[in-house]
């Protein structure tokens, strides 16, 4: 399934995340892991088309956060609770309504955005760049207006994201 990924990461760490598509069917997000000496996976369906915020019952007040021009917006909740889809809806709103350079940093890429009014650069961790911190630091040299950071789990990434937000960028993350 993940022919574009290096299996050595999975063999070394016992975990990996990736996405793949079956043309005409759907995209899928996969989390693989070892347990009890065997291989396991959790697979989630990601539709090719992004649902409308109203279909997902995302409040208008949340969608208005897309009109912010700097700072940090965190979307929190349990696994499978719609964080990534909510963030994708916010990115799509910016892409549809504003001229901006949007950079998404995700592991794996979930929703694929096409350019509308904005230019959307999508980088997948472990495929296009080494890790979140490296990608975030590099993105700050790529003239972004908006950065979607798929997750923040370590001090350096959080600190760099906060500095980016304080210096005039709009950061979305979980």
Regions found by a protein language model. Name each.
Residues 1-78, 86:
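N-terminal "pre-motor" subdomain/linker immediately upstream of P-loop NTPase catalytic cores
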Residues 30, 90, 135, 160-161:
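Aromatic/hydrophobic pocket-lining residues that form π-stacking "cages" and hydrophobic walls in ligand
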Residues 57, 130-131, 153-156:
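Conserved phosphotransfer active-site motifs of two-component signaling proteins
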Residues 76, 125-128, 150-151, 173-174:
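Glycine- and other small-residue-rich loops at beta-strand/loop junctions that grip anionic moieties
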Residues 79-80, 168:
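Walker A/P-loop
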Residues 83:
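Conserved lysine of the Walker
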Residues 108, 140-174:
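Conserved P-loop NTPase nucleotide-binding/switch module
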